[in-house]
């Protein structure tokens, strides 16, 4: 939905920009202001009170959303032998080693997440410049460098999301689809916020959750009250 379209302007008029909504109210409003032509993704953007230029203020983590994301992620796995077989059995979409690396070097990027066994990381490092900027580089901190590839595949397929603060101290992550019931969106939101709060760097001073906005890919931003850090499904 173009921001200049009549439909977008009508949707934006439903949002009181001077108000801070509860997570449940924001979820309901996101559903109401989304385009009806497609099942839009519901996203959260957070401005954190950290300085991401400092190593001790980096915020990066994963969380399993209780109701999933509404999308079955395509997963690539770098593994060989029994580990490769386990990845295939767990539902990985593409599994390989040197052959997969060559395919990616040739432009293949038709996957949403990548997992690697530890012994494959020296090889995967050859495509770090391709995977890294796209948030696809396997990393032990997010559980995507692991000998237990079957569990990692199952977690991602089941609704596990990754998040990482960017250079402007913003976090972005998905909490579901506009077709979700608002209480399920609020519960997914709560699970993610709980993890973001748990990861607060000790070096972060002042307000940690400075600004939060919920929106769909086709709708306006909805300001959420950052002080609501429990009872996420209450209006």
Swiss-Prot record:
One of its GO terms (molecular function) is tRNA binding. InterPro entries: Ribosom_uL1_bac-type, Ribosomal_uL1, Ribosomal_uL1-like, Ribosomal_uL1/biogenesis, Ribosomal_uL1_3-a/b-sand, Ribosomal_uL1_CS. Keywords: Repressor, Ribonucleoprotein, Ribosomal protein, RNA-binding, rRNA-binding, Translation regulation, tRNA-binding. GO terms for biological process: regulation of translation; translation. Gene3D superfamilies: 3.30.190.20, 3.40.50.790. CDD domains: Ribosomal_L1. The keyword Repressor applies. It holds the Pfam family Ribosomal_L1. GO terms for cellular component: large ribosomal subunit. Part of the 50S ribosomal subunit. PANTHER family: 54S RIBOSOMAL PROTEIN L1, MITOCHONDRIAL, LARGE RIBOSOMAL SUBUNIT PROTEIN UL1M. Binds directly to 23S rRNA. The L1 stalk is quite mobile in the ribosome, and is involved in E site tRNA release. Protein L1 is also a translational repressor protein, it controls the translation of the L11 operon by binding to its mRNA. Belongs to the universal ribosomal protein uL1 family. This is Large ribosomal subunit protein uL1.
């Amino acid at each position: 939905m173009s921001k200049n379209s009549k439909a977008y302007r009508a949707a934006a008029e439903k949002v009181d920009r001077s108000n801070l909504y509860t997570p449940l109210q924001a979820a309901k409003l996101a559903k109401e202001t989304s385009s009806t032509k497609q099942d839009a993704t519901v996203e959260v953007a957070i401005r954190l009170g950290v300085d991401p230029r400092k190593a001790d203020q980096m915020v990066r983590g994963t969380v399993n959303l209780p109701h999933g994301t509404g999308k079955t992620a395509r997963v690539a796995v770098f593994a060989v032998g029994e580990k490769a077989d386990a990845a295939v059995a767990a539902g990985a979409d593409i599994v390989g080693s040197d052959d997969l690396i060559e395919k990616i070097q040739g432009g293949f990027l038709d996957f949403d997440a990548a997992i690697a066994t530890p012994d494959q990381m020296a090889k995967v490092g050859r495509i770090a410049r391709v995977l890294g900027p796209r948030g696809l580089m396997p990393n032990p901190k997010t559980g995507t460098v692991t000998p237990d590839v079957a569990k990692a595949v199952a977690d991602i397929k089941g609704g596990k999301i990754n998040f990482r603060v960017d250079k402007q101290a913003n976090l972005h992550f998905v909490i579901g689809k506009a077709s979700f019931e608002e209480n399920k969106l609020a519960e997914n939101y709560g699970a993610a916020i709980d993890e973001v709060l748990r990861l607060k760097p000790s070096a972060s001073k002042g307000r940690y959750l400075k600004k939060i906005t919920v929106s769909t890919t086709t709708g306006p931003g909805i300001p959420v009250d950052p002080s609501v850090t429990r009872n996420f499904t209450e209006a």
